[in-house]
Amino acid sequence: NQISKYDPALKLAWFIPRVIIPKKTRGGKDYWIVDVIDDSSQSTKIKCWGVRPGDEIFINRPYVAKLDYDETWGFSCRGVFNFKMIG
């Protein structure tokens, strides 16, 4: 799936997180799968690598974030510090 307002040149997108699913890599490192929705009601998953204790994202609040996109793996980011609340 695609975030409708993703700008590939700037690597920026805005969205609203709906669900955060904490996971662990095979090596035991924490990461999140964040299920987000955009202004066209399209649901997309973002993998957030390098999550640290104390990191927090608020559900149902608008965010803008710098994201990487890969055709095979979809959207990802390296740390929650890339997420900026805009509301």
How would you label these PLM feature ranges?
Residues 8-11, 50-66:
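Short nucleic-acid-contacting surface segments enriched for D/E, G, S/T with interspersed K/R
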Residues 12-16, 33-35, 45-47, 64-66, ...:
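Structured core elements
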Residues 23-27, 38, 70:
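Acidic surface patches and DE-rich sequence motifs
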Residues 28-57:
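Beta-strand/loop nucleic-acid-binding surfaces
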Residues 1-22, 85:
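OB-fold nucleic-acid-binding modules
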